């Protein structure tokens, strides 16, 4: 998920943040800087923005290079070692357009959760759940599906699946962040890594059923 998930300089609490819809081009910029696979084609994008910062965990400093990564309107860097600034984007979630089919005599409206990323130097506690809840409230899906992907890159563990591990055994349950949100595993597959030649990735398909 993140470009450098091992380094988490601070913890950010989603309860101190606010969700806003954002244009896809703004989400693309954030994802290019903070998601290992970059941006993707999406229909609906949401950002999580700092409303207030409290607690020692949120006061750790980050280098100014991080400030170059967030060009979303309403956020202005104030200094090289400011940690959290009101209006700063700390996470982004992107979803597909609706896909519809018939199931048991009724129309089912399904969406894919395509991307989620938080700032690469941070861990956003409750961020995934808060962004997902906002999307569900706006669009009332019958279900939401997504994929968690885990692999290993040179010198670091890549966390595209919202979990992390150094070996195949460590990665057995790498999709736990989805499970905690109510998603159920439907299938998993192994395939050659897109990031590292000779390495294998594991992909788990998850689905959150909301109305059936």
Q: For each predicted feature, which ranges?
A:
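Short, structured interface segments
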Residues: 1-9
